[in-house]
Amino acid sequence: SRGLGDVYKRQEDNYFKEILNQINQKAFIESPSYKLYGDKKIKIDIDQAPPFESLSNYGASSGSVVFILSNLSLKYVHNSGEFFVETDELRFYPDLNIILGEHGKIDFSFESVYINTNQVILDNFSIDLKNGKIISNSSKLISKDYKPILGVFSYDPFEQDQSFTQFVFQSNSSNNEFVINKFLKLKAGVYIDGNTLSTSSKKRDQSELIFILENDKEIVLRSKSFSLINNQILSNNTQFSFIEENDSLYHPSLELKYNINTNQIQLFNLEGSLKNTPFYSTFFEVEIISDYLYYTPGQRIMNLGIMIAPDQRPVEVKSTKYYSDRIMNELTDLNGINILKATYNFVMKNRRLDFFIDDLSYALKTNSDLIRGGIIDLWRDGFISFDPLSGFVKVLPKTRHYFLSHLKRSDYDEYSFNSISPSSKNIIYDIELRSMFFNGVEKITLSNKNKMEVFPRLGKVELRRDRNLKLIGDISVGNFDFIGVDLLFDYNSYKLDLIEIDTLKMIASKDLIDNYNYLYNIGGDLLINNPRNKSSLKLLPNYPYFVSDKSTKVFFSMPEDYGPEYDSSFYFSIDQFRIDSLDKSTLPKFEFPGTFYSNNIFNPLEAKLITMPDNSFGFDLALEEK
């Protein structure tokens, strides 16, 4: 291309002649790709402080020739069309091959379901005549429905590959609000590149997609850049929060697909650095590893589950106070550095919870690349938040919990369960009831040390606030099996409210025809451990124990085994009772006061039902005393 300052030197006699000849032709620049014209009268001056200072042979500032044009309509012709820059004042520096302008305007038409623009105002701008680029670092995008958006504007003639003029505009920040409908608003940056629209800003702050739900609930999706394509909003790195009162269901990074027409939110936990990272719930106080979350705003049901190999991979649920030596040991690398211990010791020594990864590597006298994988593992497991670009780390409360639990200086729990659903319908979350309904739960571990496991009937479990559970199922603890139990688990008191028990089965002896003792149709409380000793770090000998709250019957035999005379009227009636140390390997010695009924063979006999030498139930009573 041939610009006005490309070939001219001050020392040449024809310097001004050539410049004036070019201006008389009304062309600032001509090239095969673009042309720039102006048709106003020109004032010629010497700028003693040009934008790029010109020096004489003696090193002193010699100023620069400047051509000043006012109220100019600058015509820009390129291969895909043409546009005009209306400007109050334009300063042309032929020696520098640059044009500076103020108060410029360009027609900027962009239409979408999110924003419709018609003009960009350039408070100041520059045109590089060597490449034809227009740049404005102080501009305002004017739309039909919203207030002006502050940002930066650019045009590059060599980036034009469409049949229309491709401008680029990026807002300074993400504080621009757009109302999509009465339930949905977007607080976002604006980035327009040709015919594409996204929400990244120069500041790189997060944009927010906010869904207003009933009863003061809301869903907030945050991303540094949402792609706004037709009726879809997409992002590969979206922070998700479902907020109700002071509680939330949260995930730090998911893939988002939202369709405005169907009004369905689809979130996927399958790709990226944080794939398979848990959802965190402050209401339920659990972590949930799920492949997806689907929700249609306005409805009461959210769905979560497994998409890939759903008949083999489970949804995993753990208490936020869960601790495992296995997980702790897996955080030790081949050099013997346990990254969690190193991180916690570092922040305690420096008395602050944030740092850069290079600070930690320096303290450990190692290369930051060697500990980066461990830092990402901590990030993925919810021990820290981490910015991979800057290396900034912020330590979260889970790190302290694990560190102190490992040292046996803090209580913890072993509360966990899995859900496997071949149909991928693992969790139905009713946001009105504030309950999660699980399918495909084989067992629930409440305490490994106390040998406390619950087996839901048909795999169905209802999760309520603060890890509380409701279900019908069986309980296994030591030599005791509670069969067909309608139960509630209360996490804070760490007990099972056994509302109705079909059968309490107690192993007696393998040498008997029936090696179990049975209690039928009972209820009561099963206390797993002291609420301050969920980890069973302290040895409390009576736990776990069961306290009945209603009478029951012990049938000494069964008519199908011993004949019709031994029917259901041949039994021992027990009032309320208590059984301690359910998890021990041997049965305790029972003494249950009650009444023996013998189908009218004897009058009712008051006695104590005890554990006999063969571990079966019986009583010893001298009848002649009656």
PLM segments and residue spans:
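Short acidic/glycine-rich loops and adjacent helix/strand connectors
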Residues: Y323-I327, G391-K394
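Short amphipathic alpha-helical interaction segments
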Residues: K365-R380
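Short, small-residue-biased leader/transition segments that mark boundaries at the very start
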Residues: G3-Y8
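Extended, regular secondary-structure scaffolds
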Residues: L141-K144, P148-G151, D156, I327-L334, ...
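A short, conserved structural fragment
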Residues: W379-S390
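Beta-strand-dominated lipid-handling architectures at cellular/organellar boundaries
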Residues: S31-Y280, F284-Q312, R409-L512, S569-K626
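Short amphipathic alpha-helical interface segments
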Residues: N329-L364
